Regions:
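Alpha-helical transmembrane segments in multi-pass membrane proteins
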Residues: 2, 6, 10, 15, ...
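Alpha-helical transmembrane segments within multi-pass membrane transporters and channels
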Residues: 9-30, 54, 136, 140-145
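Cytosolic, membrane-interface loops and tails of multi-pass inner-membrane proteins
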Residues: 20-51, 107
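Interfacial segments of multi-pass membrane proteins
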Residues: 44-49, 70-74, 110-140, 152-162
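A cross-family phosphate/adenosyl-ligand binding-site feature
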Residues: 55, 77-78
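Membrane-helix exit/interface motif
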Residues: 68-77, 99-103
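Interfacial loop-to-helix junctions that mark the boundaries of transmembrane helices
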Residues: 78-84, 118
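Membrane-helix interface "capping/anchor" motifs
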Residues: 100-106, 135-149
Length: 163
């Protein structure tokens, strides 16, 4: 039951669509421009650096907040399961970001939210991921390749180290 509660907590946190809300503030539906995505990269390309950074921060923090709430709720009762429950909350936040019910399940791609999950569960891995991301993007000029590489690294880290 705790796992389901953590996913729901995460999903609710993930529903905050920073790019969509910023776009609405500027009288633009970000999903009608660029790639049609409500995430950081499309917001950056469509509305500029300021909007992109605000969106990144909001998308990043939604996972951090979800994990923080789970720590507050479960650290005393389930200390041995806290890492797992944190992952459930973080993955719920990514799902809420990618599939917000109030936007007909059309959100972002979850990269900034996943970065927040990596940071919240393993800050050292986040440092490594950021370096790898920027090296790949710097060499290839493809944000998507850097993003996919980070997701793969995170999955490998979780499988190998159980984090």
């Amino acid at each position: 039951m705790e796992r389901l509660v953590c996913v729901i907590i995460g999903y609710v946190c993930g529903l905050l669509q920073t790019g969509y809300l910023y776009g609405k503030w500027k009288h633009i539906d970000i999903r009608q421009h660029g790639s049609g995505n409500a995430g950081t990269t499309n917001t950056l390309r469509t509305l500029g650096w300021k909007a992109g950074m605000i969106t990144f921060l909001g998308d990043f923090l939604k996972c951090v907040v979800a994990v923080w709430i789970v720590h507050i709720l479960y650290s005393q009762a389930y200390p041995e399961e806290l890492a797992l429950l944190s992952m459930y909350a973080g993955m719920g936040a990514v799902l809420g970001h990618n599939y917000p019910f109030y936007l007909k399940f059309k959100g972002g791609k979850g990269i900034a939210a996943t970065a927040g999950l990596i940071f919240a569960t393993n800050p050292m891995m986040m440092l490594i991921a950021a370096i790898v991301f920027w090296v790949i993007v710097g060499i290839t000029r493809y944000v998507s390749l850097g993003s996919l590489t980070i997701v793969v690294l995170f999955v490998v880290e979780v499988v190998l180290y159980g984090q």
